[in-house]
Amino acid sequence: HVALALAYVILANHDHVKLHLLQENGGASPFYRRRRRMTDCFNFLAAATPNGALDLAASLSGHLQRLRRPGKAILISDFLMPAAAYQQGLNLLRAFNLDIAAIQVLSRQEVEPQFPNGSLALVDSESAKEIKYQWNDKARREYQTRLAHHNLELKSFCHQSGIHYSLYVNDRDLGDFVFATLPAIGLFK
């Protein structure tokens, strides 16, 4: 939804947009111009199916090789990867002299897990690896502390690197995020 909302704003402002899927064999759309191409944006994104772990830098590199001129890059991700992985990817974008925005999208469940106390079997959505975990109040606090540290580290890296950054938790009003938060961080005027 975030990608579609941003595409709409860009197209409504008489600019053009190109969508890239960052995954193994991830494709790219053609450049879309004008609001009437929103259906094409929707169809392109609707056809995408997540598949496996992401090597951010390698995936970006493939798309950047075809870049003809500098512009704006908006990277939408959960950024739930090691700091070195997202830093390498974002630095690659910086090397291409792009105006970069990093939009971290998390679900409310990722921010505030509501698991019942007890034994859990968690399945990684990217690797399909299952781990057994004992969940309780202490584990919840530790998880939230680690996530907050990870997010702060990402935000700090972006700030120090001149990258626009914002966190969007998906139970928040998307219109408010796109039309109030993103202009406030300098993404749109």
Report the location of each language-model feature.
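Exposed, interaction-prone extracellular/peripheral surfaces
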Residues: 1-189
